[in-house]
Amino acid sequence: MGPQKLLNLIGNTPLMETVNLVKNKNVKLLLKLEGNNPGGSVKDRAAYNMIAAALERGDIKKGDKLIEATSGNTGIALAMIAQLFQIEIELVLPEDSTKERTQTMRAYGATVILTPASEGIIGSRDYADKKVAQGGYLMLNQFANDDNWKAHYKTTGPEIWNDTEGTVTHFVSAMGTTGTIIGTSTYLKEKNKNIQIIGAQPSDGSQIPGIRKWPQEYLPKIFDASKVDTVVDVSEEEAREMTKRLALEEGIFAGMSSGGSVAVALKIAEKLESGVIVAVICDRGDRYLSSDLFD
C-alpha cells in the first residue's frame, strides 16, 4: 500500500487477540485498537462522518463557526478534521480534563473553553447549548447526531464482522455518547441477531473519563435501548486496575474507559464455556500521563 491521505487512515484499526487475560482457551477476547486512528481515538470515526455529512448537506458553510461540548477525544478528533476543512471550532470541556487533551486541541488550532469541573460534561453541554442559542455558532451535537452512530454502522461493525469472519459472539463498548455501541450493534445484529451487545457504564459514585451514567434528561438522543442487550456497571477501581493490567499483561497502553470495557468483557469471559468477545480500546494511555492513572 502506498502513501495515504490522512482521512483515509481513519478506521480499519487492528483487532488484537489477548494472550494472558483469559484463562479459558475456548474463549477469545479480542481488542479493537482505536488508538491507532490518526487522531488517537475511536472518535475520529464519528467526527469525520459528522463533519463530512454536514458539509455534503450544506449544513456547514465556509465562514461558519462550530462549537461542541466534549470530554476530550471527540474534541481532538473534531479539531483535527475541522482544520483539514478550514473550519473554525470552539471546544467546551470540563476544567479537570487532562492537560494532554486540551493541549492537543489547541495544537490543532481549536479554541478551548473550560467549564467548572464540578459540573462535569453536563456543564459543558449546557454552556455550548447557551452559546448556540445566543447565535453565531453551529453545533454538530454528537449526543443527538445520527451521523455519529452511522459512522460505526458503516465502518466499525463491518470491520469486526469481517475480521472475526462472522464468529463474534459478544461486543463490549464503554458508553459515552453511545454512538459506538449503537452503530456497531445495528450492523452486527443485522448479521446475527444472537450477538450479545454489552455496554459498560460507571457504577454510582465512580468517575471514569469518557463514559457516563447519564441522568434521564441528559441521555443522548441517539441512544436506543433496544440495541443494547445488557448494561454493566464498572467501578473506578476496577477500570483503573484493568487499565494497568492491559499494559502489564497485554502490552496495551490505553485510557481508563478502555480498562472499564475490558473489565466488563473479562467478567463475561469468565462465565462462558466458549465464545469470541470483542472489546473496544477507545484511545491511548498517553492522554492521561498528567493524571494519577499510572502512578
Predicted regions and their residues:
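PLP-dependent amino-acid enzyme catalytic core
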Residues: 1-295
